[in-house]
Amino acid sequence: MTRKLRLGVIGAGLKAAEYAESWVKMPEIEFAALADTTAVSRQRLIDVCLAAGTPEPKGFEDYRQMLAECRGELDIVYVSTPHAFHAEQATAVAEAGLDLFLEKPMVTTVAEAERLIAAQKKSGVTIVTAFQGGLSPLVLDTRRRALAGEFGALIAISGMIWESWSSNYDGHWKQQPDISGGGFMFDTGAHMMNTVCLLANSDFDSVSAYMNNHGRQVDIATAVSARLKNGALATLTAAGEGPPGCASYITFFYSKAIVRIDAWGGWREISVGRTAEPREEAEILGNPMKNFLAIREGKMENSGSVEMGLRFARLWDAIKESAAADGASVRIVAQ
């Protein structure tokens, strides 16, 4: 009988508790340890495990203590904490030699991404960033077909995403810049940026951006005009206030086809020539742990790799720099 993979959790908030409801039923894994600075959050996740009839995981207030004491008792770690903590915690997990499933976004800056990549290369562990779009069958199929040349050359990209985010997260840590790493563009908008980075299969070359905080401490609206290193042009628009709801449209204009898809990979429309194929829909993944395990076993492409995270970080750093300079063009130098 195959031994279960021993899972450690860093950040036992609502997202982790939500996922735990399904993960605790998986025969492949068991919750072995968890760390959170809040006792209520730790107990909530422990209660999920106990309610499922599984052993109680060890609880820690400090993730560093968990890694120090349980390093030999863990196989994989899931990190779900405010964005600004990702880099330090992810790097510590990699240095401990443990495979990592990391909530999006991977890190907040290029410098953090480079440090994490160095730790990953030294230890050889698997690191996957949990973007729904990156794990979506429709997004991955689109990537495969684009790379195979089915759609022709990429000409341009138009991406839009919106949500009643400003009011939805009023007072939330996501609107505290010291721990969020950014506003709407870096939170919900991150899904759009990541799907664009993944499907464009190219780093960005130059970026011009504007942001409007609309009275908040973080960006609520963002407009980006950019050129990619493969020659394609792109516009990205993020509106973090409006009527209730959340949606996205991204259009990829190729020389042989037009592909429309949402940031999470929930639907796709493809037009080839004068023929428009019916809209395809796919369930946005409710249990991404299964995909993480498939990637870990080499059965699935790692679309959430540290290298993809670096591409994303380069774009985000350039957007921030340009917006701070009132839209001045910023050139991205990718090593």
What are these regions (language model features)?
Residues 63-73:
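Short amphipathic alpha-helix with an adjacent loop that forms part of the alpha/beta core around
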Residues 1-52:
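N-terminal Rossmann-like dinucleotide-binding module
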Residues 76, 82-134, 149:
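Beta-strand-loop-alpha-helix segment that lines the small-molecule cofactor/substrate pocket
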Residues 133-210, 215:
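Predominantly a Rossmann-like dinucleotide-binding segment in NAD(P)-dependent oxidoreductases
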Residues 56-63:
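Conserved SAM-binding strand-loop segment of SAM-dependent methyltransferases
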Residues 125, 152-155, 321-335:
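C-terminal capping/lid region of NAD(P)-dependent oxidoreductase domains
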Residues 30, 277, 295-312:
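Glycine- and charged-residue-rich phosphate/anionic-cofactor binding loop of Rossmann-like
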Residues 1, 193-266, 286-302, 318-319, ...:
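Contiguous beta-strand/loop segments that form the cofactor/metal-binding neighborhood of enzyme cores
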